[in-house]
Amino acid sequence: MSLDRIMNEAISPWMKGDGPDSDIVLSTRIRLARNLKNYHFPIMQTAEEANQITELFQQKLVNKTMRDFGSFELLKMNELTPLQRRVLVEKHLISPNLAETEFGACILSESEHISVMLNEEDHVRIQCLFPGLQLSEALQSANKIDNVFEEVVEYAFDEELGYVTSCPTNVGTGLRASVMIHLPALVLTKRINRIIQAIQQLGLVVRGIYGEGSEALGNIFQVSNQMTLGKSEEDIIADLTSVIHQLIQQEKAARELIVKNSSIELEDKVYRSYGILAHSRLIQSAEAATCLSDVRLGIDLGYIKDVSRNILTELMVLTQPGILQQYAGGQLGPEERDYRRAALIRERLRIEENEA
């Protein structure tokens, strides 16, 4: 595995498969937050301490112990260009916060479904990504990596509180479980705000696709647990799974309602969006996300039969600004990005050959 491959293949290998409920649930993520004993937390650590932690993981884990899990690559943020860091964020392999951290690093598996962030908000953040709804499977994978780390490093752990973290909401198990879910029908029927409020009352958080402070582009929402103290990993997973299953049923019911009451209007909306994607010469990322959401809904409902659902997932990633510029080989102005985005979408939908 090389940096060039990570940068030039916009779609991570793990994204190419389907998972359970993948018509509505795009992906599952498990993240475990850990800190090392006898080191200052990242907010207070020196450059020397940060580098010591990175070297510790490089020498004792990436080069040795983790070989049993396959090939891994350690990337230091201060050795990457701003554009390369942005691509990693857009592929959901690192957080926006890590991308801005001078002494941060990440460890990536070859399939990119395992990503370990070093010196972010906590010393160690183990992330596992799976397609569809696979919370238990992702947790099992993350725990395997965590167990390997714990044989080599000593974590900051309190017998009463659990794992000690920078943010109080992560103290305890250090577990953040999240699900990326596509809810266009709940948005169209204007039920989404009421449902989000109900979810938040259950102690869960609803955010946009890039986490805290981001918007729900393309009707894609990220639902995750908030507190970890006083709850077991199993309880956290069970609670979130229950809510996601309810969300899936609500979304399916909303889709059935729209088809029953407004079928022709919905079909028109789907094909208008498809027309924009198929023929536009300039398209901004927000408009592309909206149209891709409409077309994905049209595929799920059977209106569009000759386009793969996975192509839409792929295009949601491919059309992000950083990845577009990586493909172009450098920085692009806003209009040039919009032009290349439109061309890429047309090409991926195999429209150009029909227009020739």
Swiss-Prot record:
HAMAP family associated with the record = Prot_Arg_kinase
> What is the recorded name of this protein?
Protein-arginine kinase
Please give the activity regulation comment for this entry: Appears to be allosterically activated by the binding of pArg-containing polypeptides to the pArg-binding pocket localized in the C-terminal domain of McsB.
According to the UniProt entry, where does the motif RDXXRA motif of the pArg binding pocket involved in allosteric regulation sit in this chain?
337-342
Main role? Catalyzes the specific phosphorylation of arginine residues in a large number of proteins. Is part of the bacterial stress response system. Protein arginine phosphorylation has a physiologically important role and is involved in the regulation of many critical cellular processes, such as protein homeostasis, motility, competence, and stringent and stress responses, by regulating gene expression and protein activity.
Q: Which GO terms fall under molecular function for this chain's record? A: ATP binding; creatine kinase activity; protein kinase activity
The record lists the organism as Bacillus cytotoxicus (strain DSM 22905 / CIP 110041 / 391-98 / NVH 391-98)
Q: What class of enzyme is it?
A: transferase
Family that this chain belongs to: Belongs to the ATP:guanido phosphotransferase family.
Residue intervals of the Phosphagen kinase C-terminal domain: 24-254
Instruction: For this UniProt record, give its keywords in alphabetical order, as a comma-separated list.
Output: Allosteric enzyme, ATP-binding, Kinase, Nucleotide-binding, Transferase
Q: List, in alphabetical order, the GO biological process terms annotated in this UniProt record.
A: phosphocreatine biosynthetic process
GO CC entries: extracellular space
* Positions bound to ATP: 27-31, 92, 125, 176-180, 207-212
Which InterPro entries does the entry mention? Arg_Kinase, ATP-guanido_PTrfase, ATP-guanido_PTrfase_AS, ATP-guanido_PTrfase_cat, Gln_synth/guanido_kin_cat_dom
Query: What EC identifiers does the entry list?
Result: 2.7.14.1
Quickly give the catalysed reaction.
L-arginyl-[protein] + ATP = N(omega)-phospho-L-arginyl-[protein] + ADP + H(+)
